[in-house]
């Protein structure tokens, strides 16, 4: 499908396809915005951990969820600029950007209906998530509207949605519609549950995982991340990933 080539860019050289991930595109590192880092000190500690793991760029994605996390550019970007300033003062060589992780519900559909500008990263990518328990009645509508408005949708952690466990065909169909599937690295060590681990491995085996993300909320996720980056399926996923094309 030729249209997928525009969404899933080929890495600039063959080496970049198989090297370690140096760009993370899903995390909750901006303090006091959601259920991630609580303080500036927490944010800095996590950034230092990522640097020690060899990351060069972090695209952090605070939750935007109508009933719980009502973040906006006005709440997100001042925290981003403050953190970038502190990184510079401390000579921490990390590139830091911010987008968002949108929760797919009626509130999000209303944003799309208003043609409200969404927070994006890279090639106009929009990260969105679903309920872990129940499939969303809005998913086909959201995909259509996002693409119609020029966005490239990225589905966060599809392996964690229990209603899809054992049904890789459903996710293959979503992928075929031009949706990027982003698996959480920590799923590869069963951090969330064994069902999520199995699904993550199956999606990687199918070759339809284009992004791996840390989904880091705190130091507990860093500890699991260190183990997950040594797994067979982490290494198997690397050649198909586009994470490192996000390095500016």
Predicted segments with their positions:
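Extended substrate/RNA-proximal surfaces in nucleic-acid metabolism proteins
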Residues: 2, 70-177
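Active-site environment of divalent metal-dependent phosphoester hydrolases
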Residues: 65-68, 103-105, 160-164, 188-191, ...
